[in-house]
Amino acid sequence: MKILILGIFLFLCSTPAWAKEKHYYIGIIETTWDYASDHGEKKLISVDTEHSNIYLQNGPDRIGRLYKKALYLQYTDETFRTTIEKPVWLGFLGPIIKAETGDKVYVHLKNLASRPYTFHSHGITYYKEHEGAIYPDNTTDFQRADDKVYPGEQYTYMLLATEEQSPGEGDGNCVTRIYHSHIDAPKDIASGLIGPLIICKKDSLDKEKEKHIDREFVVMFSVVDENFSWYLEDNIKTYCSEPEKVDKDNEDFQESNRMYSVNGYTFGSLPGLSMCAEDRVKWYLFGMGNEVDVHAAFFHGQALTNKNYRIDTINLFPATLFDAYMVAQNPGEWMLSCQNLNHLKAGLQAFFQVQECNKSSSKDNIRGKHVRHYYIAAEEIIWNYAPSGIDIFTKENLTAPGSDSAVFFEQGTTRIGGSYKKLVYREYTDASFTNRKERGPEEEHLGILGPVIWAEVGDTIRVTFHNKGAYPLSIEPIGVRFNKNNEGTYYSPNYNPQSRSVPPSASHVAPTETFTYEWTVPKEVGPTNADPVCLAKMYYSAVEPTKDIFTGLIGPMKICKKGSLHANGRQKDVDKEFYLFPTVFDENESLLLEDNIRMFTTAPDQVDKEDEDFQESNKMHSMNGFMYGNQPGLTMCKGDSVVWYLFSAGNEADVHGIYFSGNTYLWRGERRDTANLFPQTSLTLHMWPDTEGTFNVECLTTDHYTGGMKQKYTVNQCRRQSEDSTFYLGERTYYIAAVEVEWDYSPQREWEKELHHLQEQNVSNAFLDKGEFYIGSKYKKVVYRQYTDSTFRVPVERKAEEEHLGILGPQLHADVGDKVKIIFKNMATRPYSIHAHGVQTESSTVTPTLPGETLTYVWKIPERSGAGTEDSACIPWAYYSTVDQVKDLYSGLIGPLIVCRRPYLKVFNPRRKLEFALLFLVFDENESWYLDDNIKTYSDHPEKVNKDDEEFIESNKMHAINGRMFGNLQGLTMHVGDEVNWYLMGMGNEIDLHTVHFHGHSFQYKHRGVYSSDVFDIFPGTYQTLEMFPRTPGIWLLHCHVTDHIHAGMETTYTVLQNEDTKSG
């Protein structure tokens, strides 16, 4: 404790005089909140009243649109009598708190509610007594006073906008941060206690407004889960007409309390988002919530920039912090929607008005300069997801009993099989729509996708669209400019179903009708200087986006810099271009589902469309509509310059990690081999394949991988090339074994028990408590462990700085130009292997090592395995076993490989550099090879276990950091003044979206510039370096910010000690 107080004293002494002091008087009040205060008049036409009533209509056992909530309000002074009015568009968010680097901010908090709450801020410096978060951190007395502000009490939090937590060099002048209550953070936030904190660079504000910005807006995208609110019981009693009938565990009841909202307003009811055409607008965005909170915020009709990159869709997850700049264009009322298709249906949209205020425009009118004309029809086809009938990976028939693929391809009484009637976009030669354009070999990989629409900056695109289908359809483009008369999305902000008003033709092209769209490509929508030459974009039908897209109506678009394309549309200096659309095509949502049941099942009248197994059989995990390696045309030559355009659409299941085995690519200055994609994301990746062979392009999300979202790409030796000129200077040899062990996810339960005691909660633990027949916290697992030599007798003891690795294999190191030799002994009872991301190998096949055998694996580390020029000096890759990469991973086989740039020599760095590798993974023990062993060994009543029981399955999903839960990961210790590299790794399934939050400090990361945050998003296949310079002593929380993951124990602490050099004897 003495050390801690001394540290704070020294920190204060070394801090420069604070530029200015700011005082905010914030009260926590309880009030009634209306999620749709304009009675739901504004909405997408395709959202029927019945759908909105699920969430907005109260009844005997439904709460409806009104909820009791706790909110932060701002007051004028310490009397807490007079509130300061906030902009209406803030909704239920707390007031905006702003600070510039060098400011000292005092938040005077008064709790006017009926239960204890706090104020915890992100991305700003505070000492332990101003953290506002309760967890076991060894603090006592005065340092605990901030942890709970009881009803009627006050507490003053002091926050310091220090240099270490200011926006990074590459960030905008002001960045998004947040504050919220943190006793049980998910419950406090669900109850309403969340608000925006905006941190700015020094001298970037003028009278509290960012200079050179005309309007600013803060928006939170969140599925606010009222089931987690502290006031659920009150809301049931107050708003349900027969509260005694309510079953809180009923799924439909729970869904009715999930409010898909922007700032607490749902179904387009958010007021006040208004601006002038040509206004310079700054958007501060963040997400909040749970696994369902996979958001794609889309600004219809506008183009934005973030970190100097052109964007139009922003992916937000729980606690993702984002800001974007926009010059408002196109007068009219536009939608700001979440393009997660499930969210779109459930009311997650708002409207913003762009008014004509006669501001002078610097934009030239580019219409008519160079017109590219496309003739595109929507037509019906029968589409086969795997024309060969074979799983190209296993060489088995797709309907082989017990195979992963049989679920999707079996045809029978109530199963459709692998062929579906679909609607697709196809290109014709002219407006007569008689001659279809044939696709050449370069295009055969496109599969189900529509034709590539391409244009350069300065072009006008004209698309004559003919609807040969039986439903009204449209074309909505992403990434070009159009006016309201050319918008393909079907909505009317003030639509009244009784008026029977006719929707505009562009957004509702009736069957047999034709419409010509006109879009332009001004400089403001094209690639920026930082962007690649061409941006991947997309177009789709948006009359009912969910149904239209899943029916098959989507295609790729690329928008390129002026003068960068050949006459045939291919990019200059590029040999091959490929378009990949990974998605889970949900055929249950298709417009043609009834037709498919009639055509392909043998007993259509017996089909139950609500049956879960029937629904699962229609979820086609595909790339361009192909599954299990059936995609043709992915061939290239060694040494080619290859551009991959990736894009996706869908819902929260569409969390993709697209892994290119055998090669790496460059993206935003970073070297990677796995690209993360989400609904309506698009990416442009540049690859120079350097090894011949056949490799996989696959989704690492485990359900997608087993479900068939994997293909093969081939690199041929097409021309004589000089041998690999890399001179491999160093050779490193590691002796690694696969060893079976007993692993305890939570060897100590004290931290967890103290946490619940501090929160005044008495909760059982579904994951760690054994109960009558659950497994508990101990499982048999297999892990990678290092040995001293080839005898494999003496294991290498882990040093103190390696204690944090937990279940992970040893942290392997290599420099660019090294050759890494892994002597691998399989000391386990079944075949395993060892394979690393990012490296170069002689063969594309990874040979399994049988039990008892030893094999040698060689990994070369050429330039393309190391960091990009604008990346951190050292980058992480994962290594794991690929015999069955899903079961092997969940059984425990994974570790980090750290690759550094050759000139990066630690000798020249006088400061102490620490390295911590962290794997955030929900270990699904149901998928482990050892599940049966674990039931036999650890369940008290193995004979009572039903492996298909939902609660049993859930109890085996261990939400862990390096295989430890609830504060059990030890060894994350550093000193003030250290330089720390955090190597974050993500693997796993659809639920493995992790927003990693560090209390007490921010970190820096690089994407062609240096950026700062205290939350980083990771997904299956994310490997990222974060750099931290700890300054504030204390024990600090480190956790995933996703609601269920917090409650399930994905939390630990890291310790910052005072620097020994500054201690006085």
Swiss-Prot record:
Q: Where is the active site?
A: C699 (nucleophile)
Q: Which residues bind Na(+) 3?
A: F767, G776, Y779, S955
Q: Which UniProt keywords apply?
A: Disulfide bond, Glycoprotein, Metal-binding, Oxidoreductase, Phosphoprotein, Repeat, Secreted, Signal
Cysteines engaged in disulfide bonds, as pairs? C174-C200, C276-C357, C534-C560, C637-C718, C874-C900
**What are the protein's GO molecular function terms?**
copper ion binding; ferroxidase activity; glutathione peroxidase activity; oxidoreductase activity; oxidoreductase activity, acting on metal ions, oxygen as acceptor; phospholipid-hydroperoxide glutathione peroxidase activity; protein-folding chaperone binding
Binding, Cu(2+) 4: H295, C338, H343
Which residues are Cu(2+) 3-binding?
H182, H999, H1039
Instruction: Give all Phosphoserine modified positions.
Output: S722
Q: Name one GO biological process term.
A: intracellular copper ion homeostasis
**Which Gene Ontology cellular-component terms appear in the entry?**
blood microparticle; endoplasmic reticulum lumen; extracellular exosome; extracellular region; extracellular space; lysosomal membrane; plasma membrane
Question: Per the record, what are the reactions this protein catalyses?
Answer: 4 Fe(2+) + O2 + 4 H(+) = 4 Fe(3+) + 2 H2O; 4 Cu(+) + O2 + 4 H(+) = 4 Cu(2+) + 2 H2O; a hydroperoxide + 2 glutathione = an alcohol + glutathione disulfide + H2O; 4 nitric oxide + O2 + 2 H2O = 4 nitrite + 4 H(+)
Keyword Phosphoprotein on entry: yes
Main localization is secreted
Q: What is the effect of changing I63T?
A: Retained in the endoplasmic reticulum
Binding of Cu(2+) 2: at which residues? H122, H180, H1041
Q: Where does Cu(2+) 6 bind?
A: H994, C1040, H1045, M1050
Query: Metal-binding: is it a keyword of this entry?
Result: yes
Q: What does this protein do?
A: Multifunctional blue, copper-binding (6-7 atoms per molecule) glycoprotein. It has ferroxidase activity oxidizing Fe(2+) to Fe(3+) without releasing radical oxygen species. It is involved in iron transport across the cell membrane. Copper ions provide a large number of enzymatic activites. Oxidizes highly toxic ferrous ions to the ferric state for further incorporation onto apo-transferrins, catalyzes Cu(+) oxidation and promotes the oxidation of biogenic amines such as norepinephrin and serotonin.
Q: Which family does it belong to?
A: Belongs to the multicopper oxidase family.
Pathology noted in the entry: Aceruloplasminemia: An autosomal recessive disorder of iron metabolism characterized by iron accumulation in the brain as well as visceral organs. Clinical features consist of the triad of retinal degeneration, diabetes mellitus and neurological disturbances.
Name it. Answer: Ceruloplasmin
At the highest ranks, the source species' classification is: Eukaryota, Metazoa, Chordata, Craniata, Vertebrata
